[in-house]
C-alpha cells in the first residue's frame, strides 16, 4: 500500500498508429515528444500536446528494435533488424542518415550524456561505439559469446554496461576498452540493462522473470526481485534513483521502491506482453508499449512530493574507493526527508541555532541516511542468503529421501 503522501499512477494518453508490436519508447528531453518503434518497420513521433498530429518515419526495411533521443533532443537514433542504424532529425520532414552498423540485428542504441558518442549492441555478439556526428566507427567490445540485447553508457560516459543471451551482464571501461567485470547471476538470457542515475548501481532484467541490482564498484548483488510471472523485457530508473519500473511478458508493469526494497504498484494496461517502458527525463511521466500495438503514457504521481524534496536536499556524496569509478550519491529516503521538511519549514527566528551547528546537524542527518541505506542493503543480502540456505536444505532433504537405506 502506498504512503499517504503518494498518489497512484494514472493513464494520461494512449496512442494508436503502429500496425504491429511496439518494441521501444523514449521521451525527448523536454517531454514534448515521445518516440516509439515497432515490428511494422516504422518509427512514430507522438506529440504530448493533445490534438497534435504524429509523425511516421519510414526508412528501415525491417522491424525497428530500439530508439533513443540525443541529450539535446535534436537527434533521434534507431536500430533495426535490417542491421542498420539511422540518425533522424525529429521533425515533419523525417530526414535521416543511415549506416550499416552490424552484421546482424541491431538490438540497442544509446547516446552518451555529452551527445558525442553512440553505443550499439547486436545479434552479431558485439557492442560498438560510434562518433555521433559523422557516424564514424570508433571501436568494438567483443567478449560476449551470444546475442547482445542491450548496451548503455554510464551517466558520466566513462563506463558501458551490456546484457546478453550468454546470461551475463558485462561492465566495460570506455577508455581502456577492457571488461571490468562480468555478472553471471542470471539464470537465463539477460534482456535489458541500465545504470542507476547516480552511476553507482546497475539493474538488469531477464528471461528468468527476475530483476537484479548490483553495485557497480564492489560488483556485489544488492537487490533481487522475482515479482513477475514471465520474462522481464525492459526496465527504467526514475531520475531520482528511488524507483524502478519494469515491463513484462505477463502483461504488467511493476513499480519498485528501491529505498524500501518492495513492490509499490502493479499496472494492468496492455493486452498481451508489455515489451518496453521508459520514464521521462523529469520522471513526471512514463511510457509503455506492448504487443497489442499500443503506446501508453502514464502520469507518475507517486513521486510528486518526494522527488521535489530530494532534488532540494541530498546528503554529501560518499566517495568511491577507486578513482576510476563514479562517486556514490545516495538519495534521501522519502520518510526521512519529510521529517526534515517539517523542521526546516518553521520561521528562522524560532530556531535559534548557529549556522555551523545547523550545517553539522544536516551533515549528521545525511550520514544517518547513508547508514539507513546500508542497513537496508544488508537486510536484502541476508534475506537472499536465507533463501539460498533454505533451498540447499530442501534439496538435501530430497536427496536423503531418495537415497535407499
UniProtKB/Swiss-Prot annotation:
Where, by tissue, is this protein expressed?
Widely expressed in embryonic and adult tissues.
Task: Give the span(s) annotated as Disordered.
Answer: 313-352
**Coiled-coil features, chain-numbered ranges:** 367-395
SMART domains for the chain: WD40
Q: Which GO terms describe its cellular component?
A: centriole; centrosome; ciliary basal body; cytoplasm; spindle pole
Report biased composition (Polar residues) as residue ranges.
341-352
**PROSITE patterns hit by this protein:** WD_REPEATS_1 (PS00678), WD_REPEATS_2 (PS50082), WD_REPEATS_REGION (PS50294)
WD repeats located where? 17-56, 59-98, 101-140, 143-182, 185-224, 227-266, 269-308
Disulfide cross-links? none
Keywords assigned: Cell projection, Cilium biogenesis/degradation, Coiled coil, Cytoplasm, Cytoskeleton, Repeat, WD repeat
**Family matches, as InterPro entries:** G-protein_beta_WD-40_rep, WD40/YVTN_repeat-like_dom_sf, WD40_repeat_CS, WD40_repeat_dom_sf, WD40_rpt, WDR55_POC1
The UniProt entry's GO biological process terms, in alphabetical order, are: bone development; growth plate cartilage chondrocyte development; mitotic spindle organization; non-motile cilium assembly; positive regulation of centrosome duplication; spermatogenesis
Q: Where in the cell is it found?
A: Cytoplasm, Cytoskeleton, Microtubule organizing center, Centrosome, Centriole; Cytoplasm, Cytoskeleton, Cilium basal body; Cytoplasm, Cytoskeleton, Spindle pole
Read off the Gene3D superfamilies from this record.
Answer: YVTN repeat-like/Quinoprotein amine dehydrogenase
> Where mainly found?
cytoplasm
State how it assembles.
Interacts with POC1B.
Family of this protein: Belongs to the WD repeat POC1 family.
What the protein does comes down to: Plays an important role in centriole assembly and/or stability and ciliogenesis. Involved in early steps of centriole duplication, as well as in the later steps of centriole length control. Acts in concert with POC1B to ensure centriole integrity and proper mitotic spindle formation.
This protein is called POC1 centriolar protein homolog A
Q: Which gene encodes it?
A: Poc1a
Amino acid at each position: 500500500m502506498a504512503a499517504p503522501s503518494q498518489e497512484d499512477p494514472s493513464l494520461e494518453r494512449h496512442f494508436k498508429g503502429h500496425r504491429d508490436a511496439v518494441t521501444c519508447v523514449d521521451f525527448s528531453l523536454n517531454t514534448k515528444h515521445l518516440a516509439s518503434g515497432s515490428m511494422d518497420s516504422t518509427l512514430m513521433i507522438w506529440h504530448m500536446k493533445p490534438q497534435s498530429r504524429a509523425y511516421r518515419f519510414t526508412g528501415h526495411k525491417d522491424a525497428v528494435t530500439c530508439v533513443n533521443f540525443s541529450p539535446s533532443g535534436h537527434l533521434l537514433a534507431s536500430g533495426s533488424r535490417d542491421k542498420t542504424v539511422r540518425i533522424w532529425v525529429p521533425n515533419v520532414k523525417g530526414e535521416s542518415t543511415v549506416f550499416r552498423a552490424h552484421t546482424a540485428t541491431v538490438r540497442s542504441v544509446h547516446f552518451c550524456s555529452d551527445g558525442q558518442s553512440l553505443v550499439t549492441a547486436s545479434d552479431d555478439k558485439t557492442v560498438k561505439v560510434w562518433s555521433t556526428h559523422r557516424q564514424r566507427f570508433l571501436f568494438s567490445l567483443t567478449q560476449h559469446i551470444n546475442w547482445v540485447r542491450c548496451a548503455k553508457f554510464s551517466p558520466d560516459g566513462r563506463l558501458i554496461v551490456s546484457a546478453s543471451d550468454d546470461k551475463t551482464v558485462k561492465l566495460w571501461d570506455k577508455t581502456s576498452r577492457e571488461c571490468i567485470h562480468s555478472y553471471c547471476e542470471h539464470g537465463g538470457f539477460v534482456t535489458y540493462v541500465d545504470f542507476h542515475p547516480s552511476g553507482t548501481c546497475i539493474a538488469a532484467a531477464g528471461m528468468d522473470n527476475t530483476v537484479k541490482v548490483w553495485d557497480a564498484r564492489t560488483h556485489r548483488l544488492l537487490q533481487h526481485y522475482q515479482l513477475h510471472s514471465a520474462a522481464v523485457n525492459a526496465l527504467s530508473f526514475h531520475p531520482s534513483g528511488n524507483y524502478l519500473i519494469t515491463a513484462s511478458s505477463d502483461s504488467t508493469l511493476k513499480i519498485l521502491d528501491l529505498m524500501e526494497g518492495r513492490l509499490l504498484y502493479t499496472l494492468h494496461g496492455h493486452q498481451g506482453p508489455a515489451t518496453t517502458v521508459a520514464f521521462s527525463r523529469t520522471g513526471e511521466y512514463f511510457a509503455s508499449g506492448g504487443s497489442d500495438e499500443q503506446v501508453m503514457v502514464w502520469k507518475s504521481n507517486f513521486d510528486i512530493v518526494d522527488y521535489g524534496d530530494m532534488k532540494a536536499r541530498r546528503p554529501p556524496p560518499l566517495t568511491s574507493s577507486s578513482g576510476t569509478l563514479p562517486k556514490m550519491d545516495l538519495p534521501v529516503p522519502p520518510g526521512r526527508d519529510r521529517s526534515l521538511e517539517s523542521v526546516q519549514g518553521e520561521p528562522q527566528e524560532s530556531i535559534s541555532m548557529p549556522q555551523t551547528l545547523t550545517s553539522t546537524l544536516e551533515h549528521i542527518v545525511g550520514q544517518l541516511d547513508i547508514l539507513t541505506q546500508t542497513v537496508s542493503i544488508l537486510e536484502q543480502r541476508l534475506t537472499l542468503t536465507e533463501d539460498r540456505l533454505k533451498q540447499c536444505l530442501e534439496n538435501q532433504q530430497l536427496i536423503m529421501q531418495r537415497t535407499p537405506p
